[in-house]
Amino acid sequence: MNLGERILDHYELFLGKYIGVDKYTSGEYVIQLLGFDRTFKDCLTFASLGMSNYSNLINNSCEIIMPVDDDYDNCAVVFANALFYVLQQQMDFGRGTIIEGLDNIIADFSKRHNKTAIYFTESYVLPEEFSKIEDHLKMYMAFFISEKELEFIHNYGCEEFENLLENEKA
């Protein structure tokens, strides 16, 4: 079984059966986003497949999930483009990574959703066993954040932000 098949098996074990998949390409980079509709109540969860192929560029062997509750098509495009940005910039990817400028991807996205950035962290809302595949591939979670949340992170750091989320059971 190859790595892609192991990742898919892992997703289906924890997220359920996927209901669809879309392929995204940007230059030399190719990723897929799988959709899972039963992971979180009233949300569609996107899960990347292919980020781990570029682990040498971002110093991290990983895949990322992102639950969204509205505007699924546009959210998928924004999420995929944020992942491409991580790859193109060869960012040192991990917990606390933030991608700003969502309106550069889809005009007025921030205004329509009151969200201005994507925040990446550990997949704390799922069982701990979800967080790794075979001790070398890490699973992250992403979510949209508001301007106010972004400002909080810039002022106090990701540790304080995540403490706040934990205290509020977000």
Language-model-detected regions and their locations in the chain:
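Acidic, proline/glycine-rich low-complexity IDRs
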Residues: 1-61, 65-170
